[in-house]
């Protein structure tokens, strides 16, 4: 725990200070408050009234629609925009926590020059001077733009004398678009119609976590996988590791790391032999028959043939590929193989739909290699960086930090990071909650980003685009003529959009409707795609791995922290990882069989070494990992990203090589690691208690066959015998109704968005790692994870646990001061100022959901 003034002592000092103020100010005349009983009709704001603003979430590239509720000119809660066709009112855990970007006390509050605070005028003068001195030798490094921002920056570079824009995103889909170009002549990411599929084959893609749009993927996948009309469609996870996505699978096929493409082609060979489609593939696929790839993949020919039969009998098929776990130097070839499987099985133009739009911007690490080369060669004199954090996110073996130190760096970021820490000049930018923007994430979807509140007064920041526009005008009088702000520039773009969509209203009316709706949403227009013959020339080889021996290192994406940009948000640190239930830390997944052979106990500290670096991590026993592999999640291990992020966990990127695939994307699975036991026990905090149900049937499950016979208990779930008899007045006690809520556990995927939303909605305290270790966490909803079975045939179940509002609640009967009581609607209510802190309620709660605020 960090030292400082405790909350208890703070209130003591406040009490003394308050009494002193009363004595000293006793002669001051009272001020009268005049209540606004009849507010004026032209008043734009009514106190104590909630207002909703539609905007766009910027926590990842998915650009979901967002609805932000404000009161007293302050944003209070973020939800999904129900008008948005992509996320349809839903929001992921990171979107729910995005408010902590806005109110983060570690935001840059003032401009900084070499770490020292300076006035804005001085900062802008320095920026203008270095632009003029650079004479066009400028590089702008920022996130890929899905809206107007990219064109704006390109125009700005021209106005500033020249330069080049480099796009950076650690988690990119460039390999996928390259594979789609090879297979279908469409360098785009298609729309995946999960709901039209009868069976889904997932080749190591974490589509419920960070791949594509997880919110949309979750909705469409659930529509496919949920039990309805007497049947349940199949989901098969084909991967060396079980992630949150894999935990929802009906079956896990364990494969050797990096062999996803071979498995896909083996399945395709059986299907092609059966249906005879795409005859030009016959000879090509014969080389990848189940018998020929069984040894390399670690999957028997019988199982590979079974998968092909599943695809033919339960189709249409949807095969998915991509993501970190399959990101070897053969990523493009692997994704081409998955495309071949989709085409051969008939999924193309059924469950995989291409549009005629230009693909959104994506980044390649090959471009960054060129940037690093130019920085080292002295070809660049000024480097401008936005909120992206390449110093942290890139493998140190690339040498970005060393190259960056050779030029003058200007950071236009809102948050602290390792990159801004190394910058010469920091001009703090506003967050997406306070600035204008837009996003065009897919065909027919144009989302607007508007400021939902004025700038938080403790942060002296400006909109990034307005900073650029202002400095451009100072060095070039002709720059952006007619645009006094980025809003003017944006409205000019949207006037063109208005004409394109054929809206005949005046622009003011059109603009207001855009702001009210959150954008313009048209029905997508799809085109037919076909498989290109060139795929038969794509060869799959064994993926290259640095290190002669050891275990294959699988860097996995974090559901909550993403690429590490969410690490300085306390809610995301305090919410347990759904699979490991670990908080405020990193860990290394290892198969128990492998660990025991190496003499490594669960939760021991292990040194993980590759040819590129070494870290110390906590061993976490996980049945869902290949016996010749380990997995470490990304996102932790920060040093200069804020009080919440710094000092927790490790950065797995320190173990990776500077290696690219054929699309120029970073190779995540390219090294083997050696393990060395350091300590028998680590200080790692997890909240699951016991991962096993121990026969208590807390998270019950059944099969589709049993559901067809409701007379059986497992299908009907007959009411268990109650310990207490029914209350005599129950029948007529609740008038006119009794509150109730149902959670469909078949739909729950463990995404933890509800847990983060509860923190935001109820303003729950965050207690930190130390207090969580002794059971003082304050979350009102927890996501329980239970494991059934052992070995490769294990099963993961998720069960959200919250107050059950019991009809005969144990907490109510033991409270000596009646602080908790039963209201007429059946709710377990609470009078907080009655509570004296006995905590009898917590002891007597059967579900252990009562919380006590130890602060």
Regions found by a protein language model. Give the residues of each.
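N-terminal export/assembly segments and adjacent metallocofactor-ligating motifs
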Residues: 1-274, 283, 291, 300-302, ...
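Domain-level signature for respiratory redox metalloenzymes
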Residues: 2, 67, 192-199, 233, ...
């Amino acid at each position: 725990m960090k030292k400082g003034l405790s909350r208890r002592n703070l209130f003591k000092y406040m009490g003394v200070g308050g009494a002193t103020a009363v004595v000293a100010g006793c002669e001051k005349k009272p001020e009268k408050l005049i209540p606004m009983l009849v507010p004026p009709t032209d008043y734009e704001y009514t106190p104590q009234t909630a207002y909703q603003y539609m905007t766009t979430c910027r926590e990842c590239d998915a650009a979901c629609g967002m609805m932000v509720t404000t009161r007293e000119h302050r944003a209070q809660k973020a939800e999904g925009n129900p008008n948005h066709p992509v996320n349809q009112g839903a929001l992921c855990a990171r979107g729910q926590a995005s408010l902590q970007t806005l109110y983060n006390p570690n935001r840059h509050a003032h401009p900084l020059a070499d770490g020292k605070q300076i006035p804005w005028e001085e900062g802008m003068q320095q920026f203008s001077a270095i632009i003029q001195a650079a004479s066009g030798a400028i590089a702008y490094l920022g996130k890929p733009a899905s809206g107007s921002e990219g064109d704006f920056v390109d125009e700005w570079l021209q106005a500033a004398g020249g330069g080049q824009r480099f796009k950076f995103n650690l988690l990119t889909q460039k390999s996928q678009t390259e594979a789609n170009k090879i297979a279908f002549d469409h360098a785009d990411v298609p729309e995946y119609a999960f709901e039209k599929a009868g069976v889904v084959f997932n080749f190591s893609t974490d589509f419920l976590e960070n791949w594509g749009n997880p919110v949309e993927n979750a909705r469409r996948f659930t529509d496919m996988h949920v039990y309805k009309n007497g049947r349940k469609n199949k989901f098969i996870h084909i991967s060396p590791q079980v992630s949150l996505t894999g935990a929802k699978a009906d079956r896990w096929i364990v494969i050797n790391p990096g062999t996803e493409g071979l498995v896909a082609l083996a399945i395709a060979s059986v299907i092609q032999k059966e249906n005879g489609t795409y005859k030009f593939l016959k000879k090509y696929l014969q080389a990848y028959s189940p018998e020929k790839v069984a040894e390399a993949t670690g999957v028997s020919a019988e199982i590979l043939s079974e998968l092909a039969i599943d695809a033919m009998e339960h189709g249409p098929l949807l095969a998915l590929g991509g993501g970190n776990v399959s990101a070897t130097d053969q990523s493009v070839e692997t994704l081409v193989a998955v495309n071949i499987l989709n085409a051969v099985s008939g999924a193309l133009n059924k469950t995989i739909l291409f549009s005629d739009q230009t693909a959104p911007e994506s980044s390649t690490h090959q471009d960054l290699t060129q940037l690093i080369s130019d920085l080292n060669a002295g070809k660049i004199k000024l480097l401008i960086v936005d909120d992206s954090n390449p110093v942290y996110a890139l493998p140190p073996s690339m040498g970005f930090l060393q190259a960056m130190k050779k030029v003058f760096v200007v950071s236009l970021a809102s948050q602290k990071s390792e990159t801004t820490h190394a910058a010469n000049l920091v001009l703090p930018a506003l967050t997406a909650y306070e600035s204008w923007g837009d996003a065009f994430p897919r065909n027919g979807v144009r989302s607007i980003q508007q400021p939902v509140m004025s700038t938080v007064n403790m942060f002296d920041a400006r909109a990034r685009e307005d900073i650029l526009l202002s400095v451009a005008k100072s060095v070039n009088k002709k720059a952006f003529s007619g645009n006094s702000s980025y809003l003017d520039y944006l409205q000019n773009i949207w006037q063109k959009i208005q004409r394109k969509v054929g809206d005949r209203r005046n622009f003011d009316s059109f603009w207001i409707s855009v702001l009210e709706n959150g954008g313009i949403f048209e029905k997508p227009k799809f085109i037919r795609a076909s498989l290109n013959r060139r795929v038969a020339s794509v060869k799959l080889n064994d993926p290259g791995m640095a290190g002669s021996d050891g275990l294959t290192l699988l860097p996995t994406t974090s559901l909550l922290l993403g690429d590490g940009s969410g690490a300085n948000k306390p809610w995301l640190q305090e919410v347990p990882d759904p699979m490991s239930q670990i908080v405020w830390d990193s860990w290394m997944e290892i198969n128990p069989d492998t660990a025991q052979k190496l003499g490594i106990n669960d939760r021991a500290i292990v040194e993980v070494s590759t040819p590129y670096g070494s870290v110390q991590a906590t061993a976490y026993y996980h049945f869902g990992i290949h016996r010749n592999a380990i997995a470490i999640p990304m996102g932790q291990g920060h040093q200069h990203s804020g009080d919440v992020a710094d000092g927790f966990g490790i950065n797995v990127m320190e173990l990776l090589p500077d290696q690219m695939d054929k699309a120029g994307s970073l190779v995540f699975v390219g090294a083997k690691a050696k393990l060395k036991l350091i300590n028998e026990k680590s200080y790692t905090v997890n909240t699951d208690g016991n991962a096993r149900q121990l026969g208590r049937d807390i998270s019950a499950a059944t099969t589709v066959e049993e559901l067809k016979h409701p007379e059986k208990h497992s299908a009907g779930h007959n009411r268990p015998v109650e310990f207490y008899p029914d209350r005599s007045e129950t029948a007529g006690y609740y008038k006119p109704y009794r509150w109730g809520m149902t959670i469909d556990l078949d739909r729950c995927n463990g995404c933890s968005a509800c847990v983060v939303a509860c923190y935001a909605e109820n303003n729950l305290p965050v207690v930190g790692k130390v207090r969580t270790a002794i059971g003082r966490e304050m979350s009102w909803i927890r996501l329980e994870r239970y494991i059934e079975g052992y070995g490769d045939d294990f099963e993961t179940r998720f069960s959200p646990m919250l107050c059950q509002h019991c009809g005969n609640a144990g907490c109510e009967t033991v409270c000596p001061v009646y602080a908790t009581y039963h209201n007429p609607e059946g709710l377990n209510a609470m009078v907080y100022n009655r509570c004296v802190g006995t905590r009898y309620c917590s002891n007597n709660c059967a579900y252990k959901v009562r919380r006590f605020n130890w602060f």
